[in-house]
Amino acid sequence: MAKKKKTVASNGIAHIHATSNNSIITITDINGNAITWSSSGAIGYKGAKKKTPYSAGVAAEKAAKEAMAMGLSTIKIYVNGVGRGKETAIRSLAACGLTITEIHDVTPIPHNGCRPPKKPR
């Protein structure tokens, strides 16, 4: 039996979570319901290759193509984290043909809250 094609509204939100070990891209509708997602690990990269900006770009490209197939055309981008794949993921979303209206950096920054963990030697 053929799979039913899902359609969504033309605008949505892309959440980019860039950690030091992986990059996760989730595309949602305006209400926050997930449309599609992808990550460096889900594509097939393992270990140190997941950290690279290239893998974040490939993951963003995969998520964007799936979302565009469902009818998405414009997005707002919320970036979270300090990983290396943030900028590449944004560029990949734009290169796929999605129109970007806003970019927000929502990385939590403490106003001298908890003591950070000690640095590795």
From Swiss-Prot:
<dbReference type="GO" id="GO:0006412">
    <property type="term" value="P:translation"/>
</dbReference>
<keyword id="KW-0694">RNA-binding</keyword>
<keyword id="KW-0689">Ribosomal protein</keyword>
<dbReference type="GO" id="GO:0003735">
    <property type="term" value="F:structural constituent of ribosome"/>
</dbReference>
<comment type="function">
    <text>Located on the platform of the 30S subunit, it bridges several disparate RNA helices of the 16S rRNA. Forms part of the Shine-Dalgarno cleft in the 70S ribosome.</text>
</comment>
<dbReference type="Pfam" id="PF00411">
    <property type="entry name" value="Ribosomal_S11"/>
</dbReference>
<comment type="subunit">
    <text>Part of the 30S ribosomal subunit. Interacts with proteins S7 and S18. Binds to IF-3.</text>
</comment>
<dbReference type="InterPro" id="IPR001971">
    <property type="entry name" value="Ribosomal_uS11"/>
</dbReference>
<dbReference type="GO" id="GO:0019843">
    <property type="term" value="F:rRNA binding"/>
</dbReference>
<keyword id="KW-0699">rRNA-binding</keyword>
<protein>
    <recommendedName>
        <fullName>Small ribosomal subunit protein uS11</fullName>
    </recommendedName>
</protein>
<keyword id="KW-0687">Ribonucleoprotein</keyword>
<dbReference type="InterPro" id="IPR036967">
    <property type="entry name" value="Ribosomal_uS11_sf"/>
</dbReference>
<dbReference type="InterPro" id="IPR019981">
    <property type="entry name" value="Ribosomal_uS11_bac-type"/>
</dbReference>
<dbReference type="GO" id="GO:1990904">
    <property type="term" value="C:ribonucleoprotein complex"/>
</dbReference>
<dbReference type="GO" id="GO:0005840">
    <property type="term" value="C:ribosome"/>
</dbReference>
<dbReference type="InterPro" id="IPR018102">
    <property type="entry name" value="Ribosomal_uS11_CS"/>
</dbReference>
<comment type="similarity">
    <text>Belongs to the universal ribosomal protein uS11 family.</text>
</comment>
